[in-house]
From Swiss-Prot:
Monomer. Its cofactor is Mg(2+). It comes from Shewanella amazonensis (strain ATCC BAA-1098 / SB2B). The lineage of its organism: Bacteria, Pseudomonadati, Pseudomonadota, Gammaproteobacteria, Alteromonadales. An essential GTPase which binds GTP, GDP and possibly (p)ppGpp with moderate affinity, with high nucleotide exchange rates and a fairly low GTP hydrolysis rate. Plays a role in control of the cell cycle, stress response, ribosome biogenesis and in those bacteria that undergo differentiation, in morphogenesis control. This is GTPase Obg. CDD domains: Obg. It holds the Pfam family MMR_HSR1. GO terms for cellular component: cytoplasm. Its EC number is 3.6.5.-. GTP binds at residues 166-173, 191-195, 213-216, 283-286, 314-316.
Length: 389
């Protein structure tokens, strides 16, 4: 199935049902009080994370989704039926962004997690709601409010602990094949990898972490060169980045210049992503003699002014890959728990929050909801006439 990691859809929640104006009319009760019921709330639109999905391709073909409208209220204090909610299934790792405001509504990072993206319209009020000591026969009602409409950008961000970063043909796909059972395509030409790949690494029995391989970056990717930077978003949730460098590029380019170009593209895309822990990994060490290898590594590190972790490996022969995987796992385990370190989600405001409270306060500050329909009688308000001879 084609990998689609971004889609734009329009969602509309259901409108609320309108209230009803009605009066109780039964045998022996000709002048009953108001009994108009409220309308039903409109259905809302939710996103739910589904483990069986791994692409947003379904939302490329159908882009408009409408929840059910609430029914109108009826007499005898019958409340209208609420509209059914609409649930849209998306892959785990999906982020919902409001296109009009650029507000992030939420991230679905766990199976079964549910996110409200469009709130249904509130029900209208029946005339029963407006009775009071001074208004015994109200003929007021309110209409249901409109359901929210949002244009959403759905972004699928892969959930991985380790992200691979580097130029095309640096050996990223070969490395992920060496340490996991993932089988991305490997060939001796640039941009062999066209979509992100995930692999589960088991460095020791009972231990595992997830690694993500994305298409290679080149200088000018932020301006659209190569495959651009659209796949960098898949590294946003990674806890550590492996910057893989080809120590002996076949085109004779400078590894140090390649490393600087990658860092520059990272900073253009997201300073937060560029600030993540990053390890420098020299690949294809089997192409050099041991003495020459160390000299080359020291020279590149000095040219870059690099002060972080430095590792060497040969992904093709798997030399050094197992040790690197074990160190990665130990480093990930030493990091604080993400749930504890994460900032609490911002409150998302929806259109009709607290709508009726203000409406009732304005229209009827002395609202009394006691059930006194049987005591209502127009005769209470007649003028008493006394006949005299």
């Amino acid at each position: 199935m084609k990998f689609v990691d971004e889609a734009v859809i329009k969602v509309q929640a259901g409108d609320g049902g309108s209230g009803c104006v009605s009066f109780r009319r039964e045998k022996y009760i000709p002048d009953g009080g108001p009994d108009g019921g409220d309308g039903g709330d409109g259905g809302s639109v939710y996103l739910v994370a589904d483990a069986s999905l791994n692409t947003l391709i379904d939302y490329r073909f159908e882009r408009f989704y409408l929840a059910e409208r609430g029914e109108n209220g009826r007499g005898r204090d019958c409340t209208g039926k609420g509209g059914s909610d609409l649930t849209l299934r998306v892959p785990v790792g999906t982020r919902a962004v409001d296109i009009d405001t650029d507000e992030v509504l939420g991230d679905l990072t766990e199976v079964g997690q549910k996110l409200l993206v469009a709130k249904g319209g509130f029900h209208g009020l029946g005339n029963t709601r407006f009775k009071s000591s001074v208004n015994r026969a109200p003929r007021q009602k309110t209409l249901g409010t409109k359901g929210e409409v949002r244009e959403l950008r759905l972004e699928l961000l892969l959930l991985a602990d380790v992200g691979l970063l580097g130029m095309p043909n640096a050996g990223k796909s070969t490395f992920i094949r060496a340490v996991s059972r993932a089988t991305p395509k490997v060939a001796d030409y640039p941009f062999t990898t066209l979509v992100p790949n995930l692999g589960v690494v088991n460095p020791r029995p009972g231990q595992s972490f997830v690694i993500a391989d994305i298409p290679g970056l080149i200088e000018g990717a932020a301006e659209g060169a190569g495959l651009g930077i659209r796949f960098l978003k898949h590294l946003e949730r990674c806890r550590v980045l492996l910057h893989i460098l080809d120590i002996e590029p076949i085109d004779g380019s400078s590894p140090a210049e390649s490393a600087r170009a990658i860092v520059a593209e990272l900073e253009k895309y997201s300073p937060e992503l560029a600030a993540k822990p990053r390890w420098l990994v020299f690949n294809k060490t089997d192409l050099l003699l041991e003495e020459e290898l160390q000299e080359r590594v020291d020279a590149i590190v000095a040219e870059l002014g690099w002060e972080g972790d430095v590792y060497t490996m040969s992904a093709a022969t798997r030399e050094g890959t197992k040790e690197l995987a074990e160190k990665l796992f130990d480093f990930i385990k030493s990091l604080p728990d993400e749930a504890a370190a994460a900032d609490p989600d911002k409150e998302v405001e929806f259109k009709w929050d607290n709508y009726h409270k203000a409406q009732l306060d304005d229209l009827n500050p002395d609202f009394d909801d006691s059930d006194d329909d049987d005591d209502f009688d127009d005769d209470d308000y007649d003028v008493e006439v006394i006949y005299q001879r």
